[in-house]
Amino acid sequence: MITVVTSTIRENMLERVIENFSRQSLEEKELIIILNKNDMKLGNLVAPNIRVFQLDEKKTLGECLNFGSMQARYETIAKFDDDDYYSPVYLENALRVLKDKGVDVVGKAGIFVYFKKDKLLTAFRPGMNSFFLKNKRVFLAGGTLVFKKEVLEKVPFQALNNGEDIQFQKDCLDQKLSLYSGSLHDYVLIRYPESHQHSWRVLDETFQKQCRWIAVTDTFEEYVRDGGGTL
Protein backbone atom coordinates (compact mmCIF):
# COMPACT_ATOMS: atom_id res chain seq x y z
CA MET A 1 0.00 0.00 0.00
CA ILE A 2 2.81 2.45 0.87
CA THR A 3 6.60 2.56 0.80
CA VAL A 4 8.54 4.62 3.33
CA VAL A 5 11.88 5.92 2.03
CA THR A 6 14.57 7.26 4.34
CA SER A 7 18.07 8.35 3.37
CA THR A 8 20.55 8.79 6.20
CA ILE A 9 24.21 9.49 6.96
CA ARG A 10 23.71 9.03 10.73
CA GLU A 11 24.23 5.55 12.10
CA ASN A 12 22.97 6.65 15.52
CA MET A 13 19.55 7.44 13.98
CA LEU A 14 18.90 4.02 12.43
CA GLU A 15 17.05 2.79 15.50
CA ARG A 16 14.71 5.80 15.36
CA VAL A 17 14.03 5.10 11.68
CA ILE A 18 12.98 1.53 12.50
CA GLU A 19 10.87 2.67 15.47
CA ASN A 20 8.97 5.25 13.42
CA PHE A 21 8.22 2.68 10.74
CA SER A 22 7.31 -0.16 13.10
CA ARG A 23 5.00 2.12 15.08
CA GLN A 24 2.69 2.66 12.11
CA SER A 25 -0.76 1.07 12.43
CA LEU A 26 -0.96 0.50 8.68
CA GLU A 27 -0.14 -3.15 8.04
CA GLU A 28 0.62 -3.16 4.31
CA LYS A 29 3.83 -1.16 4.21
CA GLU A 30 7.54 -1.44 3.54
CA LEU A 31 10.63 0.54 4.49
CA ILE A 32 13.57 1.33 2.23
CA ILE A 33 16.65 2.74 3.95
CA ILE A 34 19.43 4.34 1.93
CA LEU A 35 22.77 4.48 3.72
CA ASN A 36 24.54 7.47 2.18
CA LYS A 37 27.88 7.14 3.94
CA ASN A 38 30.55 4.69 2.93
CA ASP A 39 31.56 3.53 6.41
CA MET A 40 28.01 2.88 7.65
CA LYS A 41 27.21 -0.74 8.45
CA LEU A 42 24.02 -2.58 7.56
CA GLY A 43 23.83 -4.33 10.95
CA ASN A 44 20.73 -6.44 11.58
CA LEU A 45 18.28 -4.16 9.81
CA VAL A 46 17.06 -6.55 7.14
CA ALA A 47 13.51 -7.88 7.62
CA PRO A 48 10.79 -9.06 5.20
CA ASN A 49 9.37 -5.56 4.82
CA ILE A 50 12.64 -3.65 5.31
CA ARG A 51 15.28 -3.30 2.63
CA VAL A 52 18.60 -1.52 2.98
CA PHE A 53 20.76 -0.14 0.19
CA GLN A 54 24.10 1.61 0.36
CA LEU A 55 24.98 4.38 -2.08
CA ASP A 56 28.32 6.12 -2.35
CA GLU A 57 28.52 9.18 -0.13
CA LYS A 58 29.21 11.27 -3.23
CA LYS A 59 25.57 10.75 -4.19
CA THR A 60 23.32 13.63 -3.16
CA LEU A 61 20.28 13.30 -0.93
CA GLY A 62 18.07 13.97 -3.93
CA GLU A 63 19.67 11.13 -5.88
CA CYS A 64 19.29 8.80 -2.90
CA LEU A 65 15.59 9.59 -2.61
CA ASN A 66 15.05 8.95 -6.31
CA PHE A 67 16.88 5.64 -6.12
CA GLY A 68 15.00 4.50 -3.03
CA SER A 69 11.64 5.48 -4.49
CA MET A 70 12.34 3.54 -7.67
CA GLN A 71 12.86 0.37 -5.59
CA ALA A 72 9.38 0.72 -4.08
CA ARG A 73 6.95 -2.17 -4.40
CA TYR A 74 3.98 0.12 -3.73
CA GLU A 75 2.60 3.03 -5.73
CA THR A 76 2.64 5.58 -2.90
CA ILE A 77 5.84 6.94 -1.37
CA ALA A 78 6.28 8.53 2.06
CA LYS A 79 9.52 10.41 2.72
CA PHE A 80 10.54 9.97 6.36
CA ASP A 81 13.35 11.97 7.92
CA ASP A 82 15.66 9.94 10.14
CA ASP A 83 15.49 12.18 13.22
CA ASP A 84 11.83 13.15 13.65
CA TYR A 85 8.70 11.56 15.16
CA TYR A 86 5.75 9.99 13.31
CA SER A 87 2.66 8.93 15.28
CA PRO A 88 1.09 5.46 14.83
CA VAL A 89 -1.62 6.80 12.50
CA TYR A 90 0.61 9.09 10.46
CA LEU A 91 0.68 6.93 7.31
CA GLU A 92 -2.97 5.96 7.64
CA ASN A 93 -4.06 9.59 7.79
CA ALA A 94 -1.73 10.69 5.00
CA LEU A 95 -3.14 8.05 2.67
CA ARG A 96 -6.67 9.08 3.54
CA VAL A 97 -5.96 12.73 2.72
CA LEU A 98 -4.20 11.77 -0.51
CA LYS A 99 -7.27 9.80 -1.59
CA ASP A 100 -9.98 12.14 -0.29
CA LYS A 101 -8.45 15.26 -1.83
CA GLY A 102 -7.42 13.54 -5.05
CA VAL A 103 -4.04 15.28 -5.06
CA ASP A 104 -0.56 14.29 -6.19
CA VAL A 105 1.38 15.30 -3.08
CA VAL A 106 0.35 15.77 0.55
CA GLY A 107 2.31 16.97 3.55
CA LYS A 108 2.25 19.50 6.36
CA ALA A 109 3.06 23.20 6.07
CA GLY A 110 2.26 23.72 9.77
CA ILE A 111 4.11 21.35 12.11
CA PHE A 112 4.90 20.61 15.72
CA VAL A 113 8.51 21.29 16.71
CA TYR A 114 10.10 19.82 19.84
CA PHE A 115 13.26 21.41 21.21
CA LYS A 116 14.92 18.50 22.96
CA LYS A 117 17.42 20.49 25.02
CA ASP A 118 14.67 22.67 26.51
CA LYS A 119 11.99 19.92 26.52
CA LEU A 120 9.80 22.50 24.78
CA LEU A 121 6.95 21.55 22.44
CA THR A 122 5.88 24.27 20.01
CA ALA A 123 3.85 24.71 16.85
CA PHE A 124 5.38 26.30 13.76
CA ARG A 125 2.84 27.94 11.43
CA PRO A 126 -0.11 26.31 13.29
CA GLY A 127 -2.68 27.92 11.02
CA MET A 128 -1.13 26.54 7.85
CA ASN A 129 -3.27 23.42 7.47
CA SER A 130 -6.05 22.04 5.27
CA PHE A 131 -5.31 24.06 2.13
CA PHE A 132 -4.00 23.63 -1.41
CA LEU A 133 -0.60 25.11 -2.21
CA LYS A 134 -1.04 27.52 -5.10
CA ASN A 135 2.19 29.52 -5.10
CA LYS A 136 5.81 29.31 -4.02
CA ARG A 137 5.54 31.31 -0.80
CA VAL A 138 4.78 28.45 1.60
CA PHE A 139 6.01 24.86 1.37
CA LEU A 140 5.36 21.51 3.02
CA ALA A 141 7.90 20.29 5.57
CA GLY A 142 10.35 17.96 3.84
CA GLY A 143 9.86 15.14 6.31
CA THR A 144 6.11 15.02 5.62
CA LEU A 145 6.01 14.51 1.86
CA VAL A 146 3.72 11.69 0.70
CA PHE A 147 3.13 11.29 -3.02
CA LYS A 148 2.23 8.95 -5.83
CA LYS A 149 5.22 7.14 -7.28
CA GLU A 150 4.25 8.29 -10.76
CA VAL A 151 4.95 11.88 -9.71
CA LEU A 152 8.69 11.13 -9.88
CA GLU A 153 8.35 10.30 -13.56
CA LYS A 154 7.47 13.95 -14.16
CA VAL A 155 9.34 15.54 -11.27
CA PRO A 156 12.31 13.65 -9.81
CA PHE A 157 14.21 15.07 -6.86
CA GLN A 158 17.07 17.22 -8.08
CA ALA A 159 20.67 16.31 -7.25
CA LEU A 160 20.89 18.47 -4.13
CA ASN A 161 21.92 17.83 -0.53
CA ASN A 162 19.97 20.77 0.89
CA GLY A 163 16.68 22.16 -0.31
CA GLU A 164 15.85 19.16 -2.48
CA ASP A 165 12.40 18.98 -0.87
CA ILE A 166 11.61 22.65 -1.58
CA GLN A 167 12.86 22.37 -5.16
CA PHE A 168 10.75 19.23 -5.63
CA GLN A 169 7.64 21.17 -4.63
CA LYS A 170 8.53 24.10 -6.88
CA ASP A 171 8.97 21.70 -9.78
CA CYS A 172 5.64 20.04 -8.98
CA LEU A 173 3.88 23.40 -9.08
CA ASP A 174 5.60 24.23 -12.38
CA GLN A 175 4.25 20.96 -13.78
CA LYS A 176 0.73 21.81 -12.56
CA LEU A 177 0.72 18.97 -10.03
CA SER A 178 -1.47 19.42 -6.96
CA LEU A 179 -0.07 19.81 -3.43
CA TYR A 180 -2.12 19.82 -0.24
CA SER A 181 -1.25 20.63 3.36
CA GLY A 182 -3.03 18.38 5.84
CA SER A 183 -3.47 18.81 9.58
CA LEU A 184 -0.83 19.82 12.09
CA HIS A 185 -1.03 16.50 13.91
CA ASP A 186 0.89 13.19 13.95
CA TYR A 187 4.35 14.54 13.05
CA VAL A 188 7.00 16.30 15.13
CA LEU A 189 10.18 17.89 13.87
CA ILE A 190 12.72 17.31 16.64
CA ARG A 191 15.49 19.81 17.29
CA TYR A 192 18.48 18.19 18.94
CA PRO A 193 21.42 19.84 20.76
CA GLU A 194 23.98 21.77 18.73
CA SER A 195 26.15 18.74 17.93
CA HIS A 196 23.37 17.29 15.75
CA GLN A 197 23.66 18.03 12.03
CA HIS A 198 20.33 19.64 11.16
CA SER A 199 19.53 20.25 7.51
CA TRP A 200 17.64 23.36 8.66
CA ARG A 201 20.50 25.39 10.10
CA VAL A 202 18.93 27.99 12.32
CA LEU A 203 19.58 28.66 16.01
CA ASP A 204 17.02 27.18 18.40
CA GLU A 205 16.50 30.58 20.01
CA THR A 206 15.66 32.12 16.64
CA PHE A 207 13.41 29.22 15.66
CA GLN A 208 11.50 29.34 18.96
CA LYS A 209 10.57 32.97 18.37
CA GLN A 210 8.75 31.90 15.21
CA CYS A 211 6.74 29.22 17.03
CA ARG A 212 3.77 29.10 19.38
CA TRP A 213 4.78 27.57 22.69
CA ILE A 214 2.58 24.68 23.83
CA ALA A 215 4.19 22.82 26.74
CA VAL A 216 7.37 21.95 28.55
CA THR A 217 7.25 18.17 28.65
CA ASP A 218 9.32 14.99 28.52
CA THR A 219 6.60 13.20 26.55
CA PHE A 220 4.94 15.09 23.72
CA GLU A 221 3.03 12.19 22.14
CA GLU A 222 -0.31 12.95 23.81
CA TYR A 223 -0.21 16.53 22.55
CA VAL A 224 0.45 15.79 18.90
CA ARG A 225 -1.83 12.87 18.09
CA ASP A 226 -4.76 13.54 15.77
CA GLY A 227 -7.57 14.97 17.86
CA GLY A 228 -5.24 15.80 20.73
CA GLY A 229 -6.99 19.12 21.25
CA THR A 230 -3.88 21.20 21.84
CA LEU A 231 -4.70 23.98 19.36
Regions found by a protein language model. Give the residues of each.
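Acidic donor-binding loop at a coil-to-helix junction in glycosyltransferase catalytic cores
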Residues: 162-168
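Short, acidic, metal-binding catalytic loop of nucleotide-sugar glycosyltransferases
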Residues: 19-28
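Short aromatic/hydrophobic "clamp" motif used to bind/position activated sugar donors
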Residues: 77
